[in-house]
Amino acid sequence: MTAGDVVERIRKNVGVPWREATYRDTFKAGGPATPVTGIATTAFASFDVIRRAVAEGLNMIVPHEVTFWNDRDDVAVVKGDPLYTQKIDFLTRNNVVVFRMHDHMHDQRPDFLYIGSARELGLDAKHETAPGSHRFTIPETTLGRLAADVKKRVGARALRVAGDPNARVSRIQLGVGYATPSVNDAAVDVVISGEQQEVDGGFDNPEYVLDAAALGIPKGWIMLGHAVSEEAGMLEMAQWIRGFVTEVPVRLVKAGEPFWAPK
């Protein structure tokens, strides 16, 4: 089985028209003729992920995010960087092929990234107010207890929370990656999201939450981090690929959280 065979099966099973002009969902290292010994899905193909995948005998990596630190994986802008030289040399020496899956994952309905994140957070479908809304109603709790539960579930080292920890909340809006739901929605108490700007947003920044807390209005924001919010979706991706690629092992190799907080 070659990497091209795997990609062809992905295209056949993805369930949405393939974006032929995509610059994201393409080969980033190696190519379609590369023989595949195993497949690793991951949030992003860091050097550590690549090294662990190779150690596990998985030479095809399917990351959701970039490999060479820019959205287009444009090697022209990094060619003189010593990290690029070492990374591409390691990929080449170990016959590793990298094929990104980003746009078509988000095009799918339901979106694997949301399925995985909701599952990891314990937000069952029975709690979702409407299919595909990513809005959930849970038994009332405090923002502090909810944040502690989220931290435990995702294993985050650097979880960030805005809002009064004693605020009573039950209505959650989920966003993954760069998705930034508006926290001013009257039907939302807490936004749980991935990556978030801190200023200049449109009702999607922590200042609104701080003002709500000062006025005694229950609002909260829990920021997981981009990779943390989407990694569970790459487990869903691995399970999906296993459904039509049975010749080689397919599993998640976690990129993990890039940030940490000093104690």
Regions found by a protein language model. Give the residues of each.
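Hydrophobic structural segments
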Residues: 1-263
